[in-house]
Amino acid sequence: MTQLTVSKKTPKPLVSISIPVLNEAANIPALYARLTGIAARMQDRCAMEFVFSDNHSDDQTWSLLTDLAKRDDRVRAIRFSKNCGFQRSILANYLHTRGDAVMQIDADLQDPPEMVEAFFDRWKQGYQVIYGIRRKRPEGIFINAFRKLGYWVIDKLSESPIPRDVGDFRMIDRKVIDVLAATRSSNPYLRGMIAGLGFNQTGIPYDRDARVAGESKFNITRLVRLGLTAVFNHSTVPLRMASLLGIVILFISVLGAAYYVFVRLFYPDLPRGFVSTQILILFGIGLNSFLLGIIGEYLLRIFVMLRSEPIAIIEQSLNFSDQELKL
């Protein structure tokens, strides 16, 4: 069994590889083989641990992690009592890492784990946040265009600049983890949260590979939901636009009323516009519903925050003591 000793006297920094998984049994053997190869190449520069968070998989994922944890003390894992969502699983896993630097990697191997070495070099140079910038990705034209549009909208509406073509493939310093731990958001959008924290940040361009095995857990619906979370968590622009639009409509209504009075005074014989009146009423109802929907999105997030729902509930763990479990 490979032993990992974490000590303040150890001159080498500890790098935690954080890996959220959901039904990734087909990818775990290849992922583990590549991670151990990287750890062997970097053993003179740093120590490593591999921290998995299982988002309540229903395949052999947890069994495979159990076997790995028995053979290798560097493998640590937590399993949630239910699927708590991708972003929350990442945040929960961050809280259970011990590294001086933490590298986020997806189990599907689309983001090459070997880039840990390049990320580590940037971290040693003093950067606290290093993210991968996707030059190209093996997806269809429609999905790529949809993602680019989403990145553009989020960047334009967000109050803090969020890097475009950037996912969750990143390395962050322990200081960033400590700040994230203090926020304890129950509905996080980590790209926006980390971008808004400041610190010394940089990006490394790379080409994304095709998924090795299994199926992607993201579809259009989940991408839209994630995009809405990004906008409403990190921007007050929709709320201010709703207020501004209300003022504009009120101004137009006043002008319309004045025009109507003027016309009726000087042209009393003109037929009254029943159809136009109904159209205006329907327009007003639709506009009010839209604006109330925007306000409702913000109220929903306030409700979720006040409800104090835990980020995740840990059902099982591997190579963790009870004192080390944070949730």
Predicted regions and their residues:
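Hydrophobic helical membrane-anchoring modules
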Residues: 2-13, 189-327
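Donor nucleotide-sugar binding loop of glycosyltransferases
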Residues: 24-27, 57, 112
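Short helix-capping segments at alpha-helix termini
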Residues: 40-45, 69-74
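Short beta-strand/loop segment that forms part of the nucleotide-sugar
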Residues: 43-56, 78-79
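A conserved acidic beta->alpha catalytic loop
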Residues: 54-63, 109-110
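Acceptor/aglycone-binding surface of glycosyltransferases and processive sugar-polymer synthases
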Residues: 78-96, 110-193, 209-228
